A protein has these predicted regions:
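A helix-coil-helix interface module used to build multimeric assemblies
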Residues: 2-208, 214-229, 292-293, 303-307, ...
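Short, well-ordered beta-strand elements within core beta-sheets of diverse protein domains
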Residues: 125, 172, 253-261, 388-396
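Glycine-rich cofactor-pocket loops
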Residues: 149-171, 283-299, 332-339, 364-384
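Glycine-rich anion/phosphate-binding loop at the beta-strand->alpha-helix junction
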Residues: 184, 235, 244-338, 342
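Active-site-adjacent "gating/activation" loops or surface patches in catalytic cores
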Residues: 218-246
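Active/binding-pocket-proximal capping segment
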Residues: 283, 406-413
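Long, amphipathic alpha-helical stalk/connector segments used for oligomerization, subunit docking
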Residues: 307, 314-400, 406
């Protein structure tokens, strides 16, 4: 007995993933749980046995009934003991199921190979996990759309290269976040629509074992697979046309890549909000007793957005695992895919699930500081309005070249005062002292709404054309509140 084995065991005595303890929702954790996985295996064995019974193989109705009665009473300790002895997880659960249903023991897994169970179960679980992600992307899009509509016409300074640029609106900027999320949602929906079962194919995908069981009758082999798929709630024509021992591992690469695209969209949204928090323009929700720093009591850190970007970055970096695994599968299959998939697939979903819950929470409680937004606009608008000032002066008879030179000189001087002396932008004050600009309504030329183009109308069109159809498709789940534990 090792020293470690003598220690009392509780939930704090070993490693637990933060994805489980801090980030992922109960629903996503349940989807990737051992109970869900092995319960799905048993349902696959039941579907196989029932289909074999209906085709006249030596599987009795009583045996099928016994299997159905024991789908969920899984003795995990017994399964662990079998696996420690057999070193094979599928066979360990064959024996465990047989212990629970002893009269059916002899027909469990009849004609099957491990991947007839594992690949089909993984497909069912992946479909459900992708559905959760799709629903949560739709929820984030809905909340971003609501925010965009509320602030559709509120001017704010635009930024390119993180340098002041032409104004936009707070709502228009939010549509950019929602559009990225909508692109990600389309990716996820495409993955769901394209999913196929592996079907019943045997050890190398040739169906040789089933052909032998069914007396060489190919039509019965095809009927067996159709019946099996239907009993799992899957369209009979949605199995892979051909496969080796597993379904194509490029499918995992596609799924991980689609999750990475969603993660990149989340990362962009939350990074933008972190920058805006620094500018004191928009902040994520901050609770009454929340602490920003153990040392600096005044701090209001955007910790939710920071955590979401950290989780998103983790998901993006997992995507390479799927490509590596698909590329290195030899011939009909090698087992080096297994250990990697047990980590990369569930953890990508768990991390993205947590990031999406955070994003929905943030979008639902954003705090907009109008005064800060206006102050930053006021500091930059005189420069941006310089062309309109030039045109207005020329229209009143001023020499265009003289007016241009005056604006240039005063703009440079005002810019120097702002950058080098920390003074406010006094360009308008300087221009008011020039006879060239006498009588011009300079303040009127600084109406920020005159510089936002069609931003409000673009918001309206985007919400109507993109957000509203998503709301309609996901109306059953879009109002679900996110679980944010810390």
């Amino acid at each position: 007995v090792t020293k470690d084995a003598t220690h009392a065991v509780d939930e704090h005595s070993g490693y637990r993933s933060p994805l489980e303890t801090r980030n992922a929702s109960a629903r996503m954790r349940s989807t990737w749980s051992a109970r869900r996985k092995f319960g799905t295996w048993r349902r696959i064995w039941l579907a196989l046995a029932e289909s074999q019974h209906e085709l006249g193989l030596a599987v009795t109705a009583a045996q099928v009934t016994e299997l159905r009665a024991h789908l969920d009473d899984i003795d995990f300790a017994n399964a662990d003991a079998h696996e420690a002895r057999l070193r094979h997880d599928v066979m360990a659960h064959v024996h465990t199921f047989g212990d629970a249903a002893p009269h059916a023991r002899g027909i469990i897994h009849l004609g099957a190979t491990s991947q007839d169970v594992v690949c089909n179960a993984d497909t069912l679980i992946l479909r459900d996990a992708l559905t959760i992600i799709a629903e949560k992307l739709a929820r984030a899009i809905d909340r971003a759309g609501t925010f965009a509509t509320e602030y559709r016409a509120l001017p704010t300074l635009g930024w390119t290269h993180f340098q002041p640029a032409q104004p936009t609106t707070v709502g228009k900027r939010a549509t950019l976040w929602a559009q990225d999320l909508a692109i990600a949602l389309s990716e996820i929906e495409g993955r769901i629509d394209g999913m196929r079962l592996r079907g019943l194919r045997g050890a190398t995908g040739t169906q040789a074992s089933y052909l032998g069981l069914l007396g060489g009758d190919a039509a019965k082999v095809e009927a067996l697979e159709r019946s099996f798929a239907a009993k799992l709630g899957w369209p009979a024509d949605r199995c892979w046309p051909v496969c080796g021992q597993t379904y194509p591992r490029l499918v995992d690469a596609q799924i991980l890549s689609s999750l990475a695209i969603a993660a990149a969209a989340i990362h962009k949204c939350c990074n933008d909000l972190r920058l805006l928090a620094n500018l004191k323009e928009i902040e994520e929700p901050f609770e009454a007793e929340q602490i920003g720093s153990s040392a600096m009591a005044y701090k209001r850190n955007p910790m939710r957005c920071e955590r979401a970007t950290g989780l998103a970055r983790f998901v993006m970096n997992l995507s390479g695992n799927g490509l590596d695994t698909a590329a290195t599968q030899w011939l009909e299959r090698t087992l080096d895919d297994s250990a990697n998939r047990r980590l990369s697939l569930p953890e990508a979903f768990l991390a993205l699930d947590g990031a999406l819950d955070i994003l929905a929470n943030v979008f639902g409680g954003l705090v907009v500081h109008r005064a800060s937004i206006r102050a930053r606009l006021d500091a930059e608008l005189p420069f941006m309005a310089s062309e309109d000032i030039l045109l207005a002066a020329t229209a009143r008879g001023a020499d265009r070249q003289h007016a241009h030179e005056a604006i240039r000189v005063h703009s440079q001087a005002a810019g120097h005062a702002v950058k080098s002396e920390g003074k406010p932008n006094d360009l308008l004050t300087r221009l008011r002292g020039e006879a060239l600009f006498a009588g011009l309504d300079l303040d009127g030329l600084l109406d920020a709404s005159a510089y936002i183009g069609r931003a409000p109308e673009q918001v309206d069109a985007f919400v109507a054309d993109v957000v509203q159809p998503i709301r309609t498709r996901y109306r059953a789940t879009i109002a679900d509140e996110p679980q944010v534990r810390v």
